Amino acid sequence: ALALVHHLAISSNVPLPMIASTFAAMSPHAVVEFVPKEDAMVRKLLSSRRDVFPDYTIEGFREAFGERYQIVSETPITASTRTLFHLRRRD
């Protein structure tokens, strides 16, 4: 789910736990890109609205997705603020 989570969370106000539950219902494995608020794209999304997303942090992502998935790996993307997560659903 590359370039998807920040759009669902910031643009559509979908809470991270709901995103994690939806992904877990669809697939036992996931590769998810976390894009932090410091990223230019998220700053652009937030420029036209009030930031009402206190849980939209990498820690909040780990917590929300960690309830449904085991974090297999977490890889910072070089020359970027973004991080790729390889996830395996908890059964």
Named regions from a protein language model:
Residues 51-72:
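Short alpha-helix
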Residues 1-5:
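A short beta-strand submotif of the Rossmann-like class I SAM-dependent methyltransferase core
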Residues 26-30, 70, 83:
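A short pocket-lining beta-strand/turn micro-motif at the edge of beta-sheets
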Residues 7-23:
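A short, conserved alpha-helix within the catalytic core of class I
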Residues 19-41:
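Conserved beta-strand signature within the Rossmann-like core of class I S-adenosyl-L-methionine
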Residues 14, 45-51:
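Short secondary-structure boundary/capping segments
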